Structure formats: structure tokens, C-alpha cells
Amino acid sequence: MKVWMAILISILCWQSSAWAVCPAWSPARAQEEISRLQQQIKQWDDDYWKEGKSEVEDGVYDQLSARLTQWQRCFGNETRDAMMPPLNGAVMHPVAHTGVRKMADKNALSLWMRERSDLWVQPKVDGVAVTLVYRDGKLNKAISRGNGLKGEDWTQKVRLISAVPQTVSGPLANSTLQGEIFLKRKGHIQQQMGGINARAKVAGLMMRQGNSDTLNSLAVFVWAWPDGPQLMTDRLKELATAGFTLTQTYTRAVKNADEVAHVRNEWWKAKLPFVTDGVVVRAAKEPESRHWLPGQAEWLVAWKYQPVAQVAEVKAIQFAVGKSGKISVVASLAPVMLDDKKVQRVNIGSVRRWQEWDIAPGDQILVSLAGQGIPRIDDVVWRGAERTKPTPPENRFNSLTCYFASDVCQEQFISRLVWLGSKQVLGLDGIGEAGWRALHQTHRFEHIFSWLLLTPEQLQNTPGIAKSKSAQLWHQFNLARQQPFTRWVMAMGIPLTRAALNASDERSWSQLLFSTEQFWQQLPGTGSGRARQVIEWKENAQIKKLGSWLAAQQITGFEP
């Protein structure tokens, strides 16, 4: 009982972290939002089951279906069964499809495995489930999974799939098999190639009329033989002899969750003949098939791969002003996990880009990780019924504004502080945006170099700055005084690359002020436009004032 309670707690914790808390909607708003998403998913279902086509990626469909279920539970609505096909003309399964319960993580799987023995792991092949019925050694019937009890008659279609054995012998001559019809792939690497919408593609081929040639792009992976041989090894051997060789090749004995994790990771990176979305762990000992019912299989569980992309709810739209004055837009998200990384924010880009995306709080966006693990937006997959977008700040900033603090300059001023403290400029180790905000809020800096005047006592008494850290900061601020002249000029935002600035051989502020446009233009990577920007920069009143202030502080290169 304790083990089962631990598993239940693990699942509930996962669900509460994977799904956001209930939205703060009025009953009327909740009804409207639920109804709209319900109608959209119904339309996708109709397209999928009646037309054999999909207008949405499998992963997006699954996650939005989960989101709908969450909303329905939050507001007391009746929940729906995902992917429930129409049952007109449906055929009864000889043995019900149970489905498979999903484990949240390795710990949950370990708890489940602890009370079981003779366990085996298989790939969770991504396709559509099917029942194959053999009578007197011949394929008698093929039935789609449907609702687990009834499905569509796919016999004629499956008979056209050359990879499915049409005749069998021995123990299989009168048998019922359950498996997955999948899209044949050559060297599919799940980690690199993802799901490629395989499930929808298979469904499309099985639902369309007159496509006998294309059906040969399909095959079947048998994962269950109800009432088959008691020993898994015997089952695998008989299946392989009959032509279902993949089952034997991709079924391995496992003793614990560590071994499952090893195989799962191996198959995630290996070249496989099919698309997968995780692994299934099953006990060799199964109840008699007459006891099988949808949703009640206690002898097998799935551990799915983390989706490459996650659907996330936009909680807020925020605007940031960079050191150059450019306004960027950031979406604040309900937390999602991507490759073991908790993602709560994603950069949208410029205001124009944000307007093109048309993103508002309450929308659902598809987020993945780009190079170096940086979150990016792949798509807007659902827009809320009520959409209120914030007004961006006026575009009054540029590369020569906000060296001195003011209310309207708050964001660009902080961005300048973050820039000058970075490793490539003054190298103020141990302070980031939050630290600069705390210092500025407490000590009300006049300009971007005012921190040079802070005393150890002031730093120690700054809310948000730990006392143990204040001494380190004061030491860093003092060390900055010894940085080369070019580093200070970079901190002032000179519109030159470091390479160009080093090539200029400027060693003093007075020398820099007297340099002409022609001088700057001859530097590597500096054209006439950039040279004019340098002239505008050094003639700016705020820059001159900062230069004089640094001279008074006896910073290297600025002394008279």
C-alpha cells in the first residue's frame, strides 16, 4: 500500500508541475474557453478519424488535449476521452485494448517495478494500435484500437501491408495479437529527428481510399499476445518464427529502473526502423484476456520521452530596453520542462516581431530549445477567447540615451550596468541584473559609474545584497579601477568592436577626443557609417560629462 501511495503522490506531483494551476476565470469565461478548445479538438478528431488527415502535430494535439482536460476538471466539466473515434459500424475486439499508464519519471517507475518480477522493456512505437486475429492459420480480421472495446474493420487494408504475415502456424494459428502499425523508417534517430507526425501519417494512410501501394510503407510491431505462452522467451521465439521479428529484436529483460533508463537512452539515440515516443515496461505474467479492460492494465507502464517541444501558457508580455535603446519583447510563461531545463521566459524579439506573432497573455505557444539551450517560440498553437495585449513603451531610446538615471530611463540604464559589469567589459564578477537593480534602488545612482563611490558600509546595508557578498563586491569595484583604458571606453558604449578599438591604439581620453572621422574609418571593420557614429558618440554631452567624472576619479587614461 505504501508503494502505491508513493506512486500516486509522484504522479500527482508531476501533473501539478506539468499543468498550470487552475486559471482565474469567471464561470462564463471558463465556459467560453473550454467550449472553443473543445470544438477545435473535435474538428481535429473528425479530420483524423474520418478523413485520415491531421492539421496539427501529434505532440501539440496531445498537450492541448491534456490542457482541455485540466480546464474541465478545474471548472467541474465532464472530461473527454482523447482520440475517441466514431463508433459507427464498429467491430468488437476479441480482447480489449487496455492502454498503458504513464510514469512521471524514473522514481515512479522504480516504485512500480519494486513489487514485480520477470520484467521486460520494449520501445513505445509511435503509430496506431491494431488487433490482428488469426484463425486456422490465416489473417481473419484486423481491427483498429478505437475505444479499446470496439474499433473499425481494417482487414482489407492490413491485408495489403506486405510486412504483416498473412498466414501463421503452430500456437499462432488461432491467436489474437495486439500491436502498432507504424511508418517504416531507415535509421530513424529519435533524438535528432523527433516524431515527424508519424501517428497522423499512419492514420492517414489507413483511412484513405485507393492507396494500396503506399500501404507497403507500413509495418507492425506486436507488443501483446493475450493468452499466449507463459514464458516471454517462448512468446518472442514463436512471434519471430512467424515473421514478427521486430518484437524479439526490441524486447529486453530488465531488473530495475536503472537498466530501463539505460535502454531508453540507447534507443533515444540509436538508429531504429520506427519512430518512438518512449519505452514500455511490462511483466511477462499477465491476467487471462477475459479480464482485460480499457484503462485497467496493472502489468505494464510507459515512460515517455520528454517532448522536444512543449505547449506553454503565456502569463504576461514584458518589454525590455537594451543598452543600445532597442526595445525587445519577452513572454513570461507558466513553467515547462525542456531537456531537464525549467523554462519560464522566452524572448520574442522586436516589437514588430511580437506584433507579427500576435501573442497575448492567455495564449498557448509551442516552445523548444534552440542552440546552446536557448528557448525559442516555434508556433502559437492556441489563442484565448479574451485577448488583451499591453502597449509597448514609446520608441524614444537610442544608443546615446540613458547614461544618466531617470524614471523613463530605468530599463536602459539597468541594461547599461549589466553590460559594463560583464566579463568582456569591466569583469565585475558576482553581480547581475538583480544585484544592479538592488543597488540602484537603494542608492539612486546618478549615472552608470556611480557605483565607484559606494563604501563597504553602504554595500553591506543594501537590501537584497548578502553581507557575505558585499565585501566581495567592494573588492570587485576597486579592482575595476585598474582595468585598461579601452575597457572603460567599452563600458561607455563606444560603437566599435573590441578588435577595432585595440587597433586604434588609443591610450587616453584626450587622444580619443581629438581623433578624426578619417582616423576611425581606417580601422578594421569600420566603415564611414560606423566612423560617423563614433564622432556622434564622443561629442555627446553625456559622454563628455562621464569622461570628466572618470578623470576626477583618476581612472587610467582619463587623467588630464
From Swiss-Prot:
Q: Can you cite a GO biological process for this protein?
A: DNA repair
Q: Which Gene Ontology MF annotations are present? A: DNA ligase (NAD+) activity
Pfam families under this entry?
A: DNA_ligase_aden (PF01653), DNA_ligase_OB (PF03120)
Q: What is its EC number?
A: 6.5.1.2
Which residues does the entry assign to the active site, renumbered to this chain?
K124
Reactions accelerated catalytically: NAD(+) + (deoxyribonucleotide)n-3'-hydroxyl + 5'-phospho-(deoxyribonucleotide)m = (deoxyribonucleotide)n+m + AMP + beta-nicotinamide D-nucleotide
Name of the protein in its database record? DNA ligase B
Q: What is the lineage of its organism?
A: Bacteria, Pseudomonadati, Pseudomonadota, Gammaproteobacteria, Enterobacterales
**Gene designation:** ligB
